[in-house]
């Protein structure tokens, strides 16, 4: 994964899809593309559900369709009724608010468990946090949850601010502790987040969560040709 993040944008197939776009308008920050490629490439040409919160001008859904291949279902949600016109083969749009959990439940019931969730919606901290709380446990056990444009976590008009309680950045700081709860000597109980999350990744204005069941902790000691594996005592 690290090697892909370090590649130049020009070497990435998703970047090629973006710069050669001749369909609807796509608006993205250039530095997002290596992270997209690193976390999404394993889903290419596989049956999967991609849930995009915030449809923009419709071009990003088309880009994900081209990149992920013919077996992907791209589901976009937005509050703007005109986004419904973005529908085409493999792309479905549902109109509703990301803060409406009943609406989100209906979307999942219709299209199935999302393998990737990309939150590019309102960027308001209350929406980002509540959407994550609801959708993350409902994302595929081996899926990816990505929140972008997190610079808004530092902007007052989006409910943000440096070290302001309740922003998604501050929530993530607590989730780092949850990820490592089993090492806190019972100071912090392990949660479902602890057990269902393999890793958390932070980039400029972006947070990515890789889901998956973790293997039992094992300590590996190597001396010459001998390797000893033993379970760690927590």
Tell me what each language-model feature is:
Residues 1-118, 122-147, 151-234:
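A short alpha-helical cap/connector motif
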């Amino acid at each position: 994964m690290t090697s892909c993040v370090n590649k130049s944008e020009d070497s990435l197939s998703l970047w090629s899809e973006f710069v050669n776009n001749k369909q609807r308008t796509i608006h993205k920050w250039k530095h997002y593309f290596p992270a997209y490629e690193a976390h999404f490439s394993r889903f290419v040409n596989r049956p999967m559900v991609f849930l995009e919160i915030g449809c923009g001008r419709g071009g990003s859904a088309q880009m994900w369709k081209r990149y992920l291949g013919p077996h992907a279902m791209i589901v976009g949600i937005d509050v703007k009724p005109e986004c419904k016109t973005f529908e085409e083969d493999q792309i479905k749009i549902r109109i509703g608010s990301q803060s409406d959990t009943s609406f989100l439940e209906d979307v999942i019931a219709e299209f199935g468990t999302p393998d990737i969730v990309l939150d590019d919606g309102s960027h308001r901290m209350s929406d980002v946090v509540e959407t994550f709380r609801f959708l993350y446990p409902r994302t595929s056990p081996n899926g990816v949850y990505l929140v972008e444009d997190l610079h808004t976590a530092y902007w007052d008009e989006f409910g943000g601010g440096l070290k302001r309680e309740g922003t998604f950045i501050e929530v993530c700081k607590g989730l780092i502790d949850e990820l490592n709860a089993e090492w806190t000597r019972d100071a912090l109980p392990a949660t479902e987040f602890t057990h269902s999350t393999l890793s958390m990744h932070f980039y400029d204005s972006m947070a990515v969560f890789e889901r998956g069941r973790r293997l039992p902790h094992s300590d590996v000691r190597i001396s010459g040709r001998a390797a000893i594996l033993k379970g760690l005592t927590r």
